[in-house]
Amino acid sequence: MPLEMNKDVFITCAVTGSGASQDRSPHVPRSPKQIADSAIAAARAGAAIVHCHVRDPVTGVPSRDPIMFREVTDRVRDADIDVVLNLTAGMGGDIILGPAHAPLPLANSTDMASAEERVAHVAECLPEIC
């Protein structure tokens, strides 16, 4: 018996994008309030899931700061919306080797963190998915 394809559609909005997206557009939110406001607007526009990274509010550089994740989480949950909050847990696992002839030392863009540090904000904020 063939399986019937599920035709339900769920829209996911990646609010900030990943990596260093802060200079790609002036519309990429930076502060926790801007990120939460963008997530809330996406949910009101029909997104079922909002995927959030946090950023340094001044530079826009990606951050793992649990306090900023907590602010985003609280603002989204305090809004009158029904949305699945998806906090990233993908930071801190980037090893960037040098060129093939000299792979070490690691490139400056390497971002390594312990498993505990990589998910500290998840344990604190308890999003629906990460």
Put a short name on every predicted segment:
Residues 35, 42, 53, 130:
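Conserved, mostly hydrophobic/aromatic
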Residues 60-89:
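Alpha-helix-loop-beta-strand connector modules within alpha/beta enzyme cores
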Residues 2-6, 43-44, 77-80, 119-128:
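Acidic (Asp/Glu)-rich catalytic clusters
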Residues 36-45, 72, 76:
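Structured alpha-helical segments in the cores of large, soluble enzyme domains
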Residues 27-36, 64-71, 108-116:
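Glycine-rich anion/phosphate-binding loops
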Residues 94-130:
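Extended substrate/RNA-proximal surfaces in nucleic-acid metabolism proteins
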Residues 11-15, 50-52, 83-89, 128-130:
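Hydrophobic faces of well-ordered beta-strands that scaffold small-molecule active sites
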Residues 2-27, 90-104:
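N-terminal small/glycine-rich loop or linker at the start of catalytic domains
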